[in-house]
Amino acid sequence: MDKVTSEEFLITLLLSYFRIVSFLFTFPFYGSFLIPNTIRLYLAFALSFAVLSFINITPVKVNTFVEFLVYALNELLFGFSAGLILRLLFDALIIAGELIALHTGLGFLQMFIPGMTQMSLFSGFFTLYGTLIFLSLGGGEFIILGLAESFKRLPVGSFNIFYLNPEVFLNFFYESFRLGVKIAMPLILTALILNLVLAVVNRFIPQMNVFMVGLPLQVSIGLIILLLSLPLITITMSNHFQDFFKVFEYFIQSFKSP
């Protein structure tokens, strides 16, 4: 391998590294501070080297440093975009947890998960629970394979910001919000019915302190409904994750090799 080929290989390796590392730092699971930065950097380098070893990638020729910076920014943008789609998927679970906490009277309970902002107890529960379901469905392997496929569809140095379709991200945002509301819907309806019943009771028995009776009742019934609806929530998450696999695959395959 001559000097020029070695330089081209090193440049291609660095550009591949930029794409993968920006994806891993955005992806909810790998981007969590539960995984040290050093591990994530080493993992990104290992994946970059594996991609160049097992996928036939044409080395990138760079004439100037400015051209290299443009390529690097494009690769960072692509990795960030792919990771953002996954983050929108898991944000649906946070939305569901916040809605449930709001309608069960437990919104004041907060927890801290490293790598994420402070969130309600239910948001933390659904985030961890959804992550387990995602990994049990082979989501981790699927994402890595999808990222490797992106190097075939869109070789290093060929991405352009104009390839991104804003409508795709808007659809993901809509589906994320819809999934969050769908998961929280049983608890929302239960809280609505309970509040109506308490309003009627307070109308006929004004001497009763509705707040003293309603809050423990709301929490107890909310937890019971959550436990009863957990199998249905699991099925909903699984179906949505499987649909997401197809959509993410379509997102990767929508790019054409130049």
Swiss-Prot record:
InterPro entries: FliR, T3SS_IM_R
GO BP, one annotated term: bacterial-type flagellum assembly
One Pfam family in the UniProt entry: Bac_export_1
Keyword terms of this UniProt record: Bacterial flagellum, Cell membrane, Membrane, Transmembrane, Transmembrane helix
Superkingdom as given in the UniProt entry: Bacteria
Primary location: membrane
Compartment annotation: Cell membrane; Bacterial flagellum basal body
Keyword flag Transmembrane helix: yes
Membrane topology, as annotated: Multi-pass membrane protein
Record keyword Membrane present: yes
GO CC annotations, alphabetized: bacterial-type flagellum basal body; plasma membrane
Residues spanning the membrane: 9-29, 42-62, 65-85, 125-145, 181-201, 210-230
PANTHER family found in the cross-reference section: FLAGELLAR BIOSYNTHETIC PROTEIN FLIR (PTHR30065), SURFACE PRESENTATION OF ANTIGENS PROTEIN SPAR (PTHR30065:SF1)
Family of the protein in this entry: Belongs to the FliR/MopE/SpaR family.
Role, per record: Role in flagellar biosynthesis.
Name of the protein in its database record: Flagellar biosynthetic protein FliR
Organism this protein belongs to: Aquifex aeolicus (strain VF5)
